[in-house]
């Protein structure tokens, strides 16, 4: 295993970031997973994390992320 890689469970699927962003903060992981940080809500290990905390929230190997994309619409 590459020590620079990060293995995560994202929306129920195993994902590997190789190389992992440095530092491995939630905001950088979200961007590395190709999500728009302005359009998602994130649950990290069972806890919804406010967007203001993303720059300081550390993500570790084996963590669980549920990422929900906000979609506009309606009538």
Regions found by a protein language model. Name each.
Residues 1-75:
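Ubiquitin-like/PB1-type beta-grasp interaction modules and other compact soluble beta-rich domains
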């Amino acid at each position: 295993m590459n020590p620079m890689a990060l293995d995560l469970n994202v929306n129920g699927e195993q994902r590997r970031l190789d190389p992992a962003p440095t530092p491995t903060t939630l905001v950088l992981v979200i961007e590395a997973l190709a999500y728009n940080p302005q359009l998602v809500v994130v649950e990290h290990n069972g806890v919804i994390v406010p967007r203001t905390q993303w720059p300081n929230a550390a993500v570790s190997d084996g963590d669980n992320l549920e990422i929900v994309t906000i979609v506009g619409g309606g009538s």
